[in-house]
Every structure is written in C-alpha cells, then in structure tokens.
Amino acid sequence: MMSAKNMVKVMIVMFAIFLLAKSDGKPVRKRSVSEIQLMHNLGKHLNSVERVEWLRKKLQDVHNFIALGAPIFHRDGGSQRPRKKEDNVLIESHQKSLGEADKADVDVLSKTKSQ
C-alpha cells in the first residue's frame, strides 16, 4: 500500500498534468510564425518582385518604342477590325457551299430571307 506522502505527491503530479494538458489539443500559447510560412511568404514576395520587374522592362520597351516615333503594327491583323465593308468578305476558299452548310446555318438563312 502507498503512504500518504506518496499519495499526495502522485495527486499533485496528476493535478499538474491535468491543468497543463487541458487545452483541447490547442497550444496554450500562440505559436510564432513557422519557418514554412516565412518561406512561403518569401517565395510569394520574390515572385511578385520578379513580375513587377518584368512589367517595368516591358513598359520601358513600349515607352522607348513610342518615343522613337515608330509606327505601331498589329500582329497578323487579328486585333484590327475591317475598315471597309468590302474587307469583311470571306475568301472563296473559306466560304461554304450550300451543301456544306450546317442545318442551323440554313435555318437562320431561311428565317432572315422570309422577313
């Protein structure tokens, strides 16, 4: 059997463990930012700095290009709209014949002709 002194010591130790462990799985104190979070933030910052530097270089190129008075040309004319109605006509090789037309195209054409 245990003596009363040993029983008191055991009870004090158990009480201390109970008080320290009663945190429901959460840390008793707020933890500081971990090294992983710091590295993540550093990576995002370096990526942001790299993007800003790239954009600054591109804007500097555009500024220099305009400052020289060079005309601006569009690639493939894809972003330009036709200036005249005649420029909007399809090339014969790209036009569909009536046999190749989709059923939806024929329906739309028949509805517009009837009006």
From Swiss-Prot:
Keywords: Cleavage on pair of basic residues, Hormone, Secreted, Signal. Residues 73-115 are annotated as: Disordered. SMART domains: PTH. GO terms for molecular function: hormone activity; parathyroid hormone receptor binding; peptide hormone receptor binding; type 1 parathyroid hormone receptor binding. Residues 1-25 form the signal peptide. Pfam families: Parathyroid. Its main location: secreted. GO terms for cellular component: extracellular space. InterPro entries: PTH, PTH/PTH-rel. Residues 26-31 form a propeptide. It comes from the Eukaryota. One of its GO terms (biological process) is positive regulation of signal transduction. Residues 51-69 are annotated as: Important for receptor binding. It is found in: Secreted. Interacts with PTH1R (via N-terminal extracellular domain). Parathyroid hormone elevates calcium level by dissolving the salts in bone and preventing their renal excretion. Acts by binding to its receptor, PTH1R, activating G protein-coupled receptor signaling. Stimulates [1-14C]-2-deoxy-D-glucose (2DG) transport and glycogen synthesis in osteoblastic cells. Belongs to the parathyroid hormone family. This is Parathyroid hormone. It comes from Equus caballus. The gene is PTH.
